[in-house]
Amino acid sequence: MNKERTSCKHTRAEGTVTRKILAKQKEFLWPGHILYYKEPVPLDYGCGSWVTDVEGVRYLDFFGGILTTSVGHNHPKIVDRVCAQAGKLIHSSTLYPHANHVSLAEKIASITPGKLQKSYFTNSGTEADELAVMAARGYTGNYELLALRHGYSGNSAIGKTLTGQSAWRVESNIVPGFKHAINPYCYRCPYKMSYPSCDLACAQDVEEVIQTTTCGRIAGMLVEPIQGVGGFITPPPGYFSRVAEIVRHYGGVMIADEVQTGFGRTGSKWFGIEHWQVEPEIMTMAKGIANGFPMGNTVTIPEVADSLVGQGHLICTFGGNPVSTAASLATIEIMEEEASPDVVHAKGVKLRKALDSIGENSRIVGEVRGMGLMQGIEIVADKKSKTPAPEVVDEIFEKTRLKGLLIGKGGMYGNTIRLTPPLTISDDELDTAIGALQEVFSET
């Protein structure tokens, strides 16, 4: 599995295979697909922290398929478990119980905070969030929900309505019943205040939104502990505990969207919301849960799950799929053995120290933020004006690719670099990525 198929070559010429793939992409796939890089990179092979494109060029993957390949590409344990399960039973639906399904639910109950215990598996984070909305409404008897500005919840009608960025919303798909509060974006505080003297004014906005734009009773509030597509915006201490008090006061439940922050990604804890000492009634998860196999999950306290009995049938054709659950069980085992939250924390400290140094010596770095191996760099025209500079992000993207490093980007203004390597990344690989970033920022 670890044998290299090619040496590291970063001067890439677009070959015949690439041209054929991109031509078919244009002809047969929706044009709305977002492709990274001026010359898109069709991938052919992955191993550990590395991927190789169809032209034989090898890259260090520092974005992990959007925070999904938690334990690296093609980990032998996952490959073995998946192959064994595929030779035994590929599909069951939720109509028939099987060992992987219940074992994974039991495992998740053991690592999630508080009373979270009852799982319902689906196919994606979007589905998980939709199910969370339904569960919150069914449990509380209330209809309206809150989310945060700059948040992101996926491609469905409810997912796009929960999303707090106009670029990701589709007018014809917006549905009623959702309100958005100010997000805890300290770097660009709309109140022009600073933590802690601000006394968490952004958290107080949640109550103002409830009082002025809803009927005064809500089903809940869905929040990402660290906003993913929003640019890794990281709330200050105390923010979520204050928000939880407000939400529960008005009859709602807290929904933690851990699609990007879950499974040790933020270091020290299994789930991001734990850093703020909040125990949600509902939690959603996907992406890194199965290292690339399609899966979403909505886990609730027993009272929420029990309240839905008799409120309509639930079935999911691909939910709890035997192969995906086998992959997920193996993924969590690997995390426990090779990339525990404490191990991720240590790696995150190393990465953050290097990024802070880059930021101190660069005129274009406005802020470095995040936790663990979920780090963001907000790029600006200059530190004083804080003017977003998405065009500079594009320049950095192309330069890092030429150095054999694949990174991510995001943020409301498209000016945040997102760095999320596999949790199993080695120290040497971290050094390689840091070195490439240092070189690029010194040139930019």
Residue ranges and their predicted role:
Residues 2-444:
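Conserved N-terminal phosphate-binding loop of PLP-dependent enzymes in the Aspartate aminotransferase
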